Amino acid sequence: MDNTTNCTLGTEQAVQLFKEYNLFVTAFLLFLTILLQYGYATRNKVIYILKMIVLWCFWPLNIAVGAISCIYPPNTGGLVAAIILTVFACLSFIGYWIQSFRLFKRCRSWWAFNPESNAVGSILLTNGQQCNFAIESVPMVLSPIIKNGVLYCEGQWLAKCEPDHLPKDIFVCTPDRRNIYRMVQRYTGDQSGNKKRFATFIYVKHSVDTGELESVATGGSSLYT
């Protein structure tokens, strides 16, 4: 006599399970939707930080689930697939940390551990502040602006400063190189003629090297430097 227990979930049981946990599922899906839709550094930085934490948790979760699949495979084919996927997840997770530490060594910014990108922009102001910001790729042109005495770049609030504080060169760092952008144009003043309230700067990609940014003490104006 076969004493093996059938663990297959029936339709009625599945429906009952969904009825019991549908509120949790709804809240979880709403949470993910809010993170994905509003989790941008240019919109809401609190939600963006939560999004980064969730993304950081996904790799260990994938590795853990993959390890469980290797221990309890459905069949031989499933075991092979589980091993391949788990190894891929482990290598990807290790690669992320290697690249992040290389980028951190180059730019000295916690933005280096941003799982969404592999680059960090950096503006070393002449008043001693270092303003770092998230950037998805290495562009050909950067256009920081000053509005009401506040510096913005790529839509992100960086620090309070004046037009004279902007340097000749700014940088975008990647794990293997430092991209240098040189100022080619500067526009100051608004309709009232106040040159400290509004300014636009145009920086064009000038050169590429393998140097590192000098460690500059920040004035604490930005939580993200």
UniProtKB/Swiss-Prot annotation:
Residues 42-51, 99-225 are intravirion. It is found in: Virion membrane; Host Golgi apparatus membrane. Its main location: virion. The keyword S-adenosyl-L-methionine does not apply. InterPro entries: GAMMA_CORONA_M, M_CoV. GO terms for molecular function: structural constituent of virion. It holds the Pfam family CoV_M. One of its GO terms (cellular component) is virion membrane. It is a multi-pass membrane protein. Residues 1-20, 73-77 are virion surface. It comes from the Viruses. The chain crosses the membrane at residues 21-41, 52-72, 78-98. The keyword NADP does not apply. Keywords: Glycoprotein, Host Golgi apparatus, Host membrane, Membrane, Transmembrane, Transmembrane helix, Viral envelope protein, Viral matrix protein, Virion. Belongs to the gammacoronaviruses M protein family. Homomultimer. Interacts with envelope E protein in the budding compartment of the host cell, which is located between endoplasmic reticulum and the Golgi complex. Forms a complex with HE and S proteins. Interacts with nucleocapsid N protein. This interaction probably participates in RNA packaging into the virus. Component of the viral envelope that plays a central role in virus morphogenesis and assembly via its interactions with other viral proteins. This is Membrane protein. The gene is M.
